[in-house]
Amino acid sequence: NGKVYSINLGRVIYSGIYYNKQLFEQNKIAVPTTWPELVAACETFKAQNVPCMTAGGKDGWPIFVGAYGLIGAMYPDQAALVEGLWNGTIKWNDEKSLEMWTKMQVYARDMMEEGASGIAGDAAPGRFASGAVAMFPGGSWYAPAIEAAQPTFDWGYIPFPGSDTAADNQYWFGKYDQGWAIASNTPNKDAAVLYLKEFSDPANYQAFVDAVGFIPTQPTAKLNTKIGADIAPFLGNFRVGYEQYWIAPKGAGQFANPWASYFKPFGTDDDPKVLADKVQADLQAGLDAVK
């Protein structure tokens, strides 16, 4: 009803790519800002027998979450994407979406290192921190694990360059994460309010976001972390991501999602057009059911 009902503790970004600064410098590769530059970088690394990307493919979700930035680059207005899918002005098998699927196949099939499907999600940060892989697409929450695995490892974090146009690749996509709320009928209201007051003390909140790696939502806080320095230039372009808006229509099929993990070797699909038609058909089944 227009009132505050919880205190949000921070934001997370899931649309970026961690990159190994030393490998980029050694191979004289510029940090990519467009999709063609990303493709060229991966081809150069592979020619030098350096795996381009890694991710926790064994767990499934890190593969499609790793490509959320690609979806954002193609559809920067994520709320409009969801609205368009519901009203039919955007389809997962239209020309623009087919470009997205084609790029997703390149990402899953050609950019991911061989064997990524056997890497657990919690092992991927350590694999990247070992220095053996050039890039690691994933969320901002991985940064503390990377630093813990190898404190001296020199890495950076960039928006996923999924568009052919650099200006479209300057957004962060993510979500507002954990929050505290106080039940209206709690017998401990005074204690709960006092806890939130202490938690919101600038020094306490700063220590919290530094420790957990959240992007702060309290105006008093600063981006003190290593990843914060890379996030800051584009933080004004932070947008809530697709999956926070999306509510699938009841009756939609199991493939009604924009997931890169459908492609081999993580899934069974190997034709972008066939997959696009399948995804749209599964979505359409749900849309037709709720008309």
Regions found by a protein language model. Give the residues of each.
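Conserved C-terminal helix/tail region of periplasmic/extracytoplasmic solute-binding proteins
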Residues: 25, 239-291
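Periplasmic solute-binding protein
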Residues: 1-33, 39, 57-84, 175-181, ...
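Short helix-initiation/N-cap motifs at beta->coil->alpha
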Residues: 33-40, 115-129
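Short, solvent-exposed loop/beta-turn-alpha elements that line the ligand-binding surface or hinge
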Residues: 57, 74-99, 148-150, 162-171, ...
